[in-house]
A protein has these predicted regions:
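An N-terminal assembly and electron-transfer interface module characteristic of large anaerobic redox
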Residues: 1-420
Length: 420
């Protein structure tokens, strides 16, 4: 790939103009089906049915083998579309499959995940699901997961969470209560935000993705506020705002301590809590840690692929301390990045920007630019070949709020030779 096939930030007008350099439209790193399957274990009484080709079913089973501690505990079934289904439709047989799942599992609800082929042949999966739900007298939701229209597994997680709104029902609002819409593996009761909410007597109705039941999801509209800590929860938050008038706050993994402090102040206002001076002190501590980072990164150039923090905010903070981004890959577009894009445009950096299509771009750009360090994942062979400092954040326990920022900054200090 020639560097001219990528676009500089200065030539991009709006966030949504960021495009993929691949000739394949929106070719993502992982199928959105991957993202859907990652979330299947979190709802105890809702099995999943994948509707697609044999390959989709095989792909799903292989993912479960990799990510599950106990693969047999994943309630995932597959319906493989055959030639007759393409010609005559699969509605009747799909209904039989759902009946069998109901008989076997006695579930509270079922989720149907449809992949590319049903969409391409015009199969009305939503209609089949609606009719099956009526006949079986069982809540059945539908989540499309077609890779030709979605960029990555992140989109799959987002779409599945949004589909959960189909299970919800109007509830009496509970004052001083929240739902936590977070990233996978972040619903820990010991997370920074959770600890603070509990200490202040705030009731947490649902943490998702987190262990819960269909009943928990159904009653989620009883919360007075949704706290969105990860982009995958944003579609669901918007649906709940539209359907149940539940407000939401974005509390992303910011790199700027002032933004994290602002999030806490916003929560205090919405929940009518007294301001906690502890967060002011934490912001000062993390700002001091950034000052130390500045000595490690000043005058250095880097390529940014991904990190646990919000990408644009991370780049803006590194720029403040003298580091220059040569290229920046967007993994999956989201409102956390979108809200910071105007500030990004008016900054003093002008990296190449692209929607990430494949990791081969990294190798070619490393050969061209020879940066001082790389933020994201690289193969071990490429790291040895280029002798580049690679900040992949493997093994770093990432929480939320200031805890997440501290973990990332301490990792950077160690990786680039500083002292924490």
């Amino acid at each position: 790939m020639n560097k001219m096939t990528l676009t500089h930030l200065s030539n991009i007008t709006a966030y949504d103009d960021i495009s993929c350099p691949s000739k394949a439209i929106k070719r993502g790193m992982h199928c959105p089906l991957f993202g859907c399957i990652l979330l299947t274990k979190y709802i105890a009484d809702m099995p999943f049915l994948i509707v697609g080709t044999d390959e989709c079913g095989f792909y799903g089973r292989e993912i479960i083998k990799v990510v599950a501690d106990d693969p047999l505990s994943y309630p995932v079934y597959t319906y493989s579309i055959e030639e007759n289904d393409v010609v005559y439709g699969c509605g009747e047989d799909l209904l039989k499959s759902l009946q069998q799942i109901q008989k076997t599992e006695s579930p509270t609800a079922i989720c149907v995940v449809s992949t590319c082929v049903p969409e391409l042949i015009g199969e009305d999966i939503s209609g089949v699901v609606f009719e099956a739900s009526r006949q079986l007298k069982l809540p059945i939701i539908h989540c499309p997961a077609h890779n030709f229209g979605e960029n990555s597994h992140v989109d799959g997680q987002s779409d599945l969470m949004a589909a959960l709104s189909e299970l919800m029902r109007p509830c009496e609002r509970i004052e001083k209560s929240v739902n936590l819409l977070c990233g996978r593996g972040e619903a820990d009761e010991d997370s920074e935000i959770t600890r603070w909410l509990v200490q202040n007597g705030v009731n947490i109705c649902v943490r998702f993705p987190g262990r819960c039941t269909v009943a928990d999801i159904q009653n989620a509209p009883s919360a007075s506020l949704n706290i969105v800590t990860d982009p995958i929860g944003l579609k669901l938050a918007k649906k709940m705002l539209e359907q149940y008038k539940t407000p939401y706050i974005l509390f992303g993994k910011y790199a700027d301590p002032k933004r994290i402090l602002s999030c806490y102040k916003s929560l205090q206002r919405h929940l009518k809590l007294a301001e906690d001076p502890f967060w002011e002190k934490r912001a000062i501590q993390l700002q001091a840690l950034w000052e130390q980072i500045g000595y490690c990164v000043e005058g250095k150039q880097y390529i940014y692929s991904n990190s646990p923090l919000i990408s644009i905010d991370m780049i803006l903070m590194l720029e403040r301390y003298g580091a220059k981004p040569l290229a920046y890959y967007v993994i999956s577009k989201n409102d956390f990045e979108r809200e910071l894009f105007p500030e990004f445009k008016h900054s003093n950096v002008d990296p190449l920007v692209a929607l990430l299509a494949d990791f081969g771009i990294s190798e070619r750009l490393l050969e061209i630019y020879k940066p001082d360090f790389f933020i994201g994942r690289l193969s071990e062979n490429l790291i040895r070949k280029t002798e580049i400092s690679c900040l992949d954040f493997e093994g770093v326990s990432i929480g939320q709020g200031f805890d997440a920022l501290q973990a990332v900054l301490e990792y950077i200090m160690k990786a680039l030779g500083g002292q924490t």
